[in-house]
Amino acid sequence: MHLSVDSDEFSKIFGKNLKNVGKTFPGVELVHFCANDAHREVWDGYGLPQNLGTTIFWYFIVPKIQEMLKIVGCEYVFLFAADLTPYEELIRYYSDQLKFEKADEHCVAIPMYDFTCQFMSQKTCELEGKRKQFFEEFNV
């Protein structure tokens, strides 16, 4: 619980939505994953078929997660998509390009910071296959 919020205030905010959970899943959160607009033009100049963020994720971030899996238990990689657009462009990007899924079947403890965001996740045991597929289709 956040130190600046006492338990009574927390109960008022969440009321009946405050739940005790019977099971939790080990995971790692991908935080503030976004492209630097100052480098988009440089990346676009290379003429590659994939965008910068997708390439960074599959080429650099996923191998780091795989290294981490050698020493800690982790079942999911997850993020909170800050997408308030009517057509959910960011959510579609995370789904189509990075292979995250909306996790509506799980009850999620959402931090206050991410309260308006969409929780998305994917199983770490599927990352290698998805990464391989990304590189097989890189120049398609």
What label would you give each PLM region?
Residues M1-L48, Y59, P63-V140:
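Non-catalytic substrate-recognition and accessory regions of acyl/acetyltransferase enzymes
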Residues T55:
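Short alpha-helical segment within the catalytic ATP-binding CA
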